[in-house]
Every structure is written in structure tokens, then in C-alpha cells.
Amino acid sequence: MAENLEIPADLKPADGRFGCGPSKVRPEQLKALAASGDLFGTSHRQAPVKNLVGRVRDGLRQLFALPDGYEVILGNGGSTAFWDAAAFGLVDKRSLHLTYGEFSAKFASAVAKNPFVGDPIIVKADAGSAPKPQSDPSVDVIAWAHNETSTGVAVPVVRPDGSGDALIVIDATSAAGGLPVDITEADAYYFAPQKNFAGDGGLWLAILSPAALARVDAIAAAGRWVPEFLSLPIAIENSLKNQTYNTPAIATLILLAEQIDWLLGNGGLDWATKRTAESSSRLYSWAEAASFATPFVADPALRSQVVGTVDFSDSVDAAAVAKVLRANGVVDTEPYRKLGRNQLRVGMFPAVEPDDVSALTACVDWVVERL
């Protein structure tokens, strides 16, 4: 059986986790978690946990070099919850969405179901490509994903010409902390801990500009009904006190804080993005040279530094390759389930060693030769 193939130990990566979320958690984070037992089982309204939340917020402020007036806001529920929160609390009348994969389309879908706003404008591209950011005079929110996790397409964060007062709302779930960004080009840059920040899910974080904060206030003042769990005014009020509206998962916050400190200690966002650029360069160079593989994203300018997708020729069964890799401790290289392509998908977040990406490609070569 193919899955019984045993990859030589000297070819294997030091750490075989290449998932695109949840992603590799560094051992040092887990040690810090184990050493923080006195925080567990204590009130999130008291100083010890509030200081932990403050550590996360201050670290992100430093990591992204936030200008005065920008705030780090957080709440429970992950990016999925933030889509609904933004649909209620950031879209005033109408929005425009660039969709080019599963996750960029989901925010558009959430807005389309919101009874308080007009039908969104959808600008769509096929998986593996992306539309160019654009504006429309009828919209007050323009939204896209900095990194489309399902396909490995990255779209830069730049305010489109003619966007005026429209808020630029960026899904950075798998981008924040691993892709370059000028935060002043966005009004809401939202993400979750289980990608570049090597943590657990269940939490959303959003960097909001003064314009976004003002929009939240204006919509609330107009009396729009919003479920309290999805209320951005409530999230903002609590975040400014270094709290969440309802009880957070302490372990998630500890892992996140440790990863932020690690990124800052190594040189911040500049260091992190150089590291992911190195990892992705190794993956794409290998794919371009391999006789049986090619990068799924044809345009090099759109290829993600943090999520790499590699198509295989019909002569090679990528699912069989992934099965052998998994049996050998090299895990989570399977493609996004709904994409339905003969490919591997590789997470290359900052916690992943570039040398491990090179080792992964060597393992794939070894397996393909023997299938």
C-alpha cells in the first residue's frame, strides 16, 4: 500500500505541520501556556486577565505601527462572527465585495442576508485569480480578502481610486502578521489567531480606523437593531477596557500574546514578511521546476506568501501523496475541500521554518517517484 511508504528520516522536516489554520504552534508557546496556570479559572474582569488582553492589544499596536486614533478591538466568535458584526455595524447602506474564493464570498453572503442594507455589488473572479480593487459611488464599504485562504491568492491592501468616504474592510484572517500591509490603507483589518499568530480559534480581532469607529457610532445612533453578541459598539466599549463582552478563552489569548511577542522580538512585521517570502519562494521555485507540478495561481503577483497551492499533473494523485505524507507525520497538506483540485496546499506562516518547506518539497519528490 502506498501509505506504507516510509520517508527517510533525513528528508523529513523538523516539524511536519503545514496546515493553513489551525497552524503550527511553537513549543515555546505551549511552555508559556503551561506556566500561566494562575490565570485560569479567574475573572476576565479583573487585572490579571485584563492585563493579558492589554498585552495583546499593545503588541498588535506595535506590530502594525498603528497611527493615533486606530484601535485594536476584539471579541469572541472568530472571523465568521465578525462578518455578521460588520454587516450590522459597518455597512450603512450598501457595500461592494471582491470575491475570488470561499472566504471572500462569505462576507458578501452575510451582507446579502442583512435586512437593513441594500443588495451588495459583487465583483467576482475565478478561483486562482482575483479582481482588481475598485470603487462605486453607491457604496459605503469596499471589502476583499488580503489573503484568500482557500486558493492561495493575495490581493494588496490599497484604497481604490474614487473610494471617497467608503470604508475599506479587509479580511486579513490568514494575512495579518505574515503579509506586508500599510494599515492606513484600510479602515477595518480583521483577523483571527489560528493562522500567522499560531494560536487557537474562537476569537476575532479588528484594527479599526477613526472613520470606522465613527461609522459604528453613527449606525448605532440611528437605532439599527443588532444582536448584542454581534454589537460592535459593545465590543469597542469592552476592548477599550481590555475586556471582551463575554468570557474569552484564556489559552487562546496566551498563545496569541506569546506569538506577538516572538514576532516583535525577531524584528516585527518586516522580519515576519521576509520569512514568509523566503518560505514561499522555495515552494514556488520547486513547483515551477518540477515536471509534475505547477503553482495553481498563474500570476506570480497574486501568489500568497503564506498559503501556497500547487497543482499536480493528471499522472500524479495529489490525494495519495498527501496520504503518504500524513502517514509519515507531515500533515495538513490537503487542498481546501470545496476547491476540488488535484493539488496540495501548504501553510507557510512565520512559525514554519523555511528549511522545513524545502524538506517538504524533497519529501513530495521522494513520494511521487515511488507511487
From Swiss-Prot:
<feature type="binding site">
    <location>
        <position position="194"/>
    </location>
    <ligand>
        <name>pyridoxal 5'-phosphate</name>
    </ligand>
</feature>
<keyword id="KW-0032">Aminotransferase</keyword>
<dbReference type="GO" id="GO:0008615">
    <property type="term" value="P:pyridoxine biosynthetic process"/>
</dbReference>
<comment type="similarity">
    <text>Belongs to the class-V pyridoxal-phosphate-dependent aminotransferase family. SerC subfamily.</text>
</comment>
<dbReference type="InterPro" id="IPR015424">
    <property type="entry name" value="PyrdxlP-dep_Trfase"/>
</dbReference>
<dbReference type="GO" id="GO:0006564">
    <property type="term" value="P:L-serine biosynthetic process"/>
</dbReference>
<feature type="binding site">
    <location>
        <position position="103"/>
    </location>
    <ligand>
        <name>pyridoxal 5'-phosphate</name>
    </ligand>
</feature>
<keyword id="KW-0808">Transferase</keyword>
<dbReference type="InterPro" id="IPR015421">
    <property type="entry name" value="PyrdxlP-dep_Trfase_major"/>
</dbReference>
<keyword id="KW-0028">Amino-acid biosynthesis</keyword>
<keyword id="KW-0664">Pyridoxine biosynthesis</keyword>
<comment type="function">
    <text>Catalyzes the reversible conversion of 3-phosphohydroxypyruvate to phosphoserine and of 3-hydroxy-2-oxo-4-phosphonooxybutanoate to phosphohydroxythreonine.</text>
</comment>
<dbReference type="InterPro" id="IPR006272">
    <property type="entry name" value="Pser_aminoTfrase_mycobac"/>
</dbReference>
<dbReference type="GO" id="GO:0004760">
    <property type="term" value="F:L-serine-pyruvate transaminase activity"/>
</dbReference>
<comment type="pathway">
    <text>Cofactor biosynthesis; pyridoxine 5'-phosphate biosynthesis; pyridoxine 5'-phosphate from D-erythrose 4-phosphate: step 3/5.</text>
</comment>
<feature type="binding site">
    <location>
        <position position="45"/>
    </location>
    <ligand>
        <name>L-glutamate</name>
    </ligand>
</feature>
<keyword id="KW-0663">Pyridoxal phosphate</keyword>
<feature type="modified residue" description="N6-(pyridoxal phosphate)lysine">
    <location>
        <position position="195"/>
    </location>
</feature>
<dbReference type="GO" id="GO:0005737">
    <property type="term" value="C:cytoplasm"/>
</dbReference>
<dbReference type="GO" id="GO:0008453">
    <property type="term" value="F:alanine-glyoxylate transaminase activity"/>
</dbReference>
<feature type="binding site">
    <location>
        <begin position="246"/>
        <end position="247"/>
    </location>
    <ligand>
        <name>pyridoxal 5'-phosphate</name>
    </ligand>
</feature>
<feature type="binding site">
    <location>
        <position position="171"/>
    </location>
    <ligand>
        <name>pyridoxal 5'-phosphate</name>
    </ligand>
</feature>
<dbReference type="GO" id="GO:0004648">
    <property type="term" value="F:O-phospho-L-serine:2-oxoglutarate aminotransferase activity"/>
</dbReference>
<comment type="subunit">
    <text>Homodimer.</text>
</comment>
<feature type="binding site">
    <location>
        <position position="149"/>
    </location>
    <ligand>
        <name>pyridoxal 5'-phosphate</name>
    </ligand>
</feature>
<dbReference type="InterPro" id="IPR022278">
    <property type="entry name" value="Pser_aminoTfrase"/>
</dbReference>
<dbReference type="GO" id="GO:0019265">
    <property type="term" value="P:glycine biosynthetic process, by transamination of glyoxylate"/>
</dbReference>
<protein>
    <recommendedName>
        <fullName>Putative phosphoserine aminotransferase</fullName>
        <ecNumber>2.6.1.52</ecNumber>
    </recommendedName>
</protein>
<keyword id="KW-0963">Cytoplasm</keyword>
<dbReference type="InterPro" id="IPR015422">
    <property type="entry name" value="PyrdxlP-dep_Trfase_small"/>
</dbReference>
<dbReference type="Pfam" id="PF00266">
    <property type="entry name" value="Aminotran_5"/>
</dbReference>
<dbReference type="InterPro" id="IPR000192">
    <property type="entry name" value="Aminotrans_V_dom"/>
</dbReference>
<keyword id="KW-0718">Serine biosynthesis</keyword>
<comment type="pathway">
    <text>Amino-acid biosynthesis; L-serine biosynthesis; L-serine from 3-phospho-D-glycerate: step 2/3.</text>
</comment>
<dbReference type="GO" id="GO:0030170">
    <property type="term" value="F:pyridoxal phosphate binding"/>
</dbReference>
